Amino acid sequence: MKPLILPWRGRDMPHAVLDINRGCNIRCRACYNQRPSGQRTLAEVEQDLSAMVQARRLHTITIGGGEPTLHPQLPAVVAAVRRHGLRVALMTNGLRLDGPLLAALKEAGLDLVLLHVDGGQTRPDLPDVSAEAVQRLRLDKARLVDRHGLTAGLIVTAYRDQPEDLINSVQLVLAHPELRYLVLTGHADFEGYGEISGSPAEGLRARFVGGSNQMKMEHFAALFERNFQARPFARLPSKGLAAYNAWLSYRAVSGQGTSTFLTSSLLERLAVRVLRCLGGRHVFLHVETPRAALVQVGLNAVLGGRMGGLRHLLNGPLAMKYIVCQQGPTPDAQGRLSICGDCPDAVFRDQAWWPVCLADRIVR
């Protein structure tokens, strides 16, 4: 079957980013934060949350920044999100993560820790930026998170000139039970765009068109097909003048040292509709037991997915692996930007949704 088209539009978008601070304790090659250091108070966070749940039927909120672990009341922020009946993920470089903080975040209700560890970072715990050192640090951080009862995933910036890092990160997630999620964010030339004008509703325009080395979805798809014989599970179309897949989702099942990439079937198409009807919102962050994964793999194969997944059913405990590829804002020759349709990774400012990767650069 063709990839499932994610029905996330308007108020039915199930995800957003809660932006709680600016300032960071490392430096990244492709950072899009532009505002000076500062943090939202708990009262301001509560106001943000109230506005966000009114504007979207949210299922999951991801806490970001800046580096959110620098916020002195991060566990209280997590608890505030949970009080709205939402799942909570945290984007962090992991530098400040330790046992006491992870225990506090677990108690507050955190579900998922997305660790951003890249070779393009300048950070004190990565003096050696070799591929082996980066992979080792990613796994060490994931195991620390897992030991404290939290689900771990990775955020990796994907560069066209470094395809081996994408391949390595996928292999790492497939091979290790401590890792369940991988978000691959395609590098875009944010610095080269300069100031951005307009709005997501009316259209966005960059002052300059930027460089020509953007990581686009055709590059992601080719790498997955060539290295993993994987086809997309689901897709999210772009919004703007250019038509492309802003998100591609891949799903794999792993067990006993082997992995198989699945394709969507009638099961997932029905599940999307049924869960939306029963819960009043779409599901964003999937959390299932090994037994549920076994049932899902079996039904997926029977109802039109990839039959190769069946070979895992007798291999003991199974784990689903979720991988998302994201193409950044893409300019045409006049600087007009195409973005994710109703961007899932949007922040709520001035009573409107703004793509998190552009929000600091848009002149309003």
Regions found by a protein language model. Give the residues of each.
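A short, compositionally biased domain-edge/stem linker segment
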Residues: M1-P7
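Canonical Radical SAM [4Fe-4S] cluster-binding loop centered on the CxxxCxxC motif
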Residues: P7-E44, A55
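Conserved, mostly hydrophobic/aromatic
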Residues: C24, C28, L90, Q351
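A short local loop/turn or secondary-structure capping micro-motif enriched for an aromatic residue
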Residues: S37-R40, L267-A271, I362-R364
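Radical SAM/AdoMet-radical enzyme domain recognition
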Residues: E46-I63, H71-H187
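Radical SAM enzyme [4Fe-4S]-AdoMet core and its adjacent flexible, acidic
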Residues: A131-Q135, D146-N315
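Flexible mid-to-C-terminal extensions adjoining Fe-S/redox cofactors in radical SAM and related proteins
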Residues: R276-R364
